Amino acid sequence: MSIAPDGRKLLRLEVRNAETPIERKPPWIKTRAKMGPEYKELKALVRREGLHTVCEEAGCPNIFECWEDREATFLIGGEQCTRRCDFCQIDTGKPADLDRDEPRRVAESVQAMGLRYSTVTGVARDDLPDGGAWLYAETVRQIKALNPNTGVELLIPDFNADPDQLRAVFESRPEVLAHNVETVPRIFKRIRPGFRYERSLAVITAARDYGLVTKSNLILGMGETPEEVRAALHDLHDAGCDIVTITQYLRPSPRHHPVERWVHPDEFVDHERYATEIGFAGVLAGPLVRSSYRAGKLYAQTVAKRSAVSLSNGEIA
């Protein structure tokens, strides 16, 4: 294999990755489809209206639960990312021109689906003067204008930690500002060459300093050790991260990073317990957890925990 699905020549790293066959999944990597009434209604509506969600297009295993809770995730910024992470199925390349009408369409999709909570994520747009900050912020504004009772979680790239670009995004006031570090420092450069670990932590700190609820994600199975996971959890908590999700890496294709280990569910239980003990307000860990999984419930849990802490400290909520 020397050509990627999008027609470009494979990178040397991708050629090396492809030498390792796709791994066989362990028995605990499976889901049961529970198609409740809310899920069935949303499924029919999405098909009828021609709407697009990450949930369907990425084949997320949690779609049945999330749609039953009226939660969904949308991808903005196009189908090409200006950076390449070795675990990510989104293609790298020159993106299409900025679609300034996209925020309106996403907001209308949220309205049509009657969502209680929406997650918006997107590609890195280093080709744009503002890194795509306007697009992310405007999408939040449009959703809130059309859906005042819908929560919005915004999962952003790092915008190179540019203060002006970050401020433009923060001013849109999503319920949760998420930025995923994804892996531990020792293998970070190998897995995410376009990002920097400390820079990602700085983005989370900036969001927390702005007064936003913050969130991040760790993907296990790419070469880290359990001890490194705990150290990364400390780094995230010290940076001001309120919510963390921890998941198993599932390889999208042979050209992506091989799975180094299948993390047993018991280890996820240990990590969730540890993250809670060191002070995270919201934690979810498991083989099939994804960063947007049960996002609305995690946000509500975090707000309730913050309020309880304020009351116990004698503060006025």
Curated annotation (Swiss-Prot):
Gene3D superfamilies: Aldolase class I
Catalysis performed (reactions): [[Fe-S] cluster scaffold protein carrying a second [4Fe-4S](2+) cluster] + N(6)-octanoyl-L-lysyl-[protein] + 2 oxidized [2Fe-2S]-[ferredoxin] + 2 S-adenosyl-L-methionine + 4 H(+) = [[Fe-S] cluster scaffold protein] + N(6)-[(R)-dihydrolipoyl]-L-lysyl-[protein] + 4 Fe(3+) + 2 hydrogen sulfide + 2 5'-deoxyadenosine + 2 L-methionine + 2 reduced [2Fe-2S]-[ferredoxin]
Residues binding [4Fe-4S] cluster 1: C55, C60, C66, S292
An annotated Gene Ontology molecular function: lipoate synthase activity
Cofactor binding note: Binds 2 [4Fe-4S] clusters per subunit. One cluster is coordinated with 3 cysteines and an exchangeable S-adenosyl-L-methionine.
PROSITE patterns with a match to the protein in the record: RADICAL_SAM (PS51918)
EC primary class: transferase
Domain named Radical SAM core: residues: 67-281
S-S bonds: none
Cofactors that this protein relies on: [4Fe-4S] cluster
InterPro entries with a match to the protein in the record: Aldolase_TIM (IPR013785), Elp3/MiaA/NifB-like_rSAM (IPR006638), LIAS_N (IPR031691), Lipoyl_synth (IPR003698), rSAM (IPR007197)
Predominant localisation class: cytoplasm
Binding site for [4Fe-4S] cluster 2: C81, C85, C88
Gene Ontology cellular-component annotations: cytoplasm
Enzyme Commission (EC) number: 2.8.1.8
The entry's keywords: 4Fe-4S, Cytoplasm, Iron, Iron-sulfur, Metal-binding, S-adenosyl-L-methionine, Transferase
UniProt keyword Transferase, yes or no: yes
Subcellular location: Cytoplasm
Similarity comment text for this entry: Belongs to the radical SAM superfamily. Lipoyl synthase family.
Name of this chain's protein: Lipoyl synthase
Organism: Mycolicibacterium gilvum (strain PYR-GCK) (Mycobacterium gilvum (strain PYR-GCK))
Gene: lipA
